[in-house]
Amino acid sequence: MYKNLIIFAMALFLTLGASAQNKREFRGAWIQCVNGQFMGKSTQQIQSMLSKQLDELEKDGVNAIIFQVRAECDALYESQLEPWSKFLTGIQGQAPNPYWDPLAWMVEQCHKRGMEIHAWINPYRAKHGSTSMSQVSKNSVVVKQPKLCFSYDNLVLLNPGLQESADYVCKVAADIVSRYDVDGFHIDDYFYPYPVAGKQIPDQALFQQNSHGYWNIGDWRRDNVSRFVKQLGETIHHIKPWVKFGVSPFGIYRNKRNDPNGSETNGLQNFDDLYADVLLWVNNGWIDYCVPQLYWEIGHKAADYKTLITWWNKHAGKRPLFIGEDIERTAKFADPANPRSHQLPAKHKLHQQMQNVKGTVLWYAQTAADNVGNIGHTLRDFYWKYPALPPLMTFLDNKSPKAVRSLKLKWTEQGPMLNWKAPKGKKWGDVANRFVVYQFKEGEPVDLNDASKIIKITYDSNVKVPYIKDGKTTYIVTALDRVGNESKGKKKKIKF
């Protein structure tokens, strides 16, 4: 009896917390390749595994996938610039057999489920620590252009101090963005290497040769990375202005002991250790969204989650702020205020309290799909029960598309189907990219701000609707442009 009361109380708590969901929210999940989940599997097995992940993530309410397509200057897509990834086929430079293009396939699969897809690259890493030099392809930049690289511990990296390195990465990015219908382009937290005790970055001579006027090597390194980030964003937007450029930095910018404006934390720092001045990029508008990786728990002694989400909310609000969440750690640790619960309810509450936090990215997709700690099902049943539109990015485009045309009900073998035509538009900002379908039962007020009335967000121009026997049902369909601006609604009343 007591156990049942606890379960009831927990469900009631979650239900109350989910009663007012955000209509716009980034709900992402990272799908990585470096964990080896694709290695040793056939094309069919990989596609089956990814399909199952995407199906579960769609049920969980995820609306964006961040898919790793470049781990070590390699490719999980057809490329003339870099070799096929060993994390796909087991051998760097070897094409998949049977042949397929994972990025092209993922674009199709994500859009079929109404999800955005963001292509994720590691910008500087040229050889992963798990890859031996004998495994490096002759077509790798490590072999073809070794002067662009330096070794550090068991890694090989493109040298951020060389403009040729920035140009090389931007060329790769331009190739991806121009050939694939991606909604976003994403780089992770690996800039200058994570420091290893007793190891020095071998760029002293380069600094002395070309310091760009800096006296301090740390300032010079930060400038190298910042100029690259700015160039990369400009490269992407020159080709496709609607592609969202995002960064997922390490979770601590600076500790307060190093900077009065830093966080009350004691850990590795973006600014000082990775030479990544993330706030400069945010405040100058060089990136379109920021996803600090806050993988710690509430109550962590060195890097408390509550301290960090509050800090990022205060300092990084000039661009949409999403929070990187570690599912396994969230499930592992109890809520300090409610020891019978994992930390998802408390973290969700913090998200709702932060004005500048516009979404979440789950680390990592497989753990959500496997429902580790019941996190995935909690999202689908409570916090992400209804679909969500992407956060607005008015700095990219602030004009809504025109309304959909010719909204009609048709009967098909699958049952009743709503069909419509996309609005006409000549410029990219006027073209409809997705559609939102709202359903209002008889007597319900028609309110497009009510997220609970969204039944589908789709890239298609049709949607199957349920057969409702009694009363009239009102459907409203709106169009979204490439950035997510929403049109006025087109209404259709139906009585079966």
Write out the residue ranges for each language-model feature.
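Active-site-adjacent "subsite" loops/lids of carbohydrate-active enzymes
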Residues: R24, Q32, G36-S48, A119, ...
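Substrate-binding cleft of secreted/luminal carbohydrate-active enzymes
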Residues: Y275-K301, G317-F395
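Pro/Thr/Ser/Gly-rich low-complexity, intrinsically disordered linker/stalk tracts
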Residues: N374-G429, G484-F496
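Catalytic domains of carbohydrate-active enzymes, especially glycoside hydrolases
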Residues: S48-A75, R179-D183, L280, W286
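Aromatic- and acidic-residue-enriched segments that line the glycan-binding/catalytic groove
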Residues: A75-G90, R125-Y152, D189-H212, K256-L268
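Beta-strand-rich modules
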Residues: V465-S487
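Solvent-exposed loop/turn segments flanking beta-strands in beta-repeat/beta-sandwich domains
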Residues: P423-D450
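Active-site neighborhood of glycoside hydrolase catalytic domains
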Residues: E164-V172, S178-I187, F191-L294, G299-K318, ...
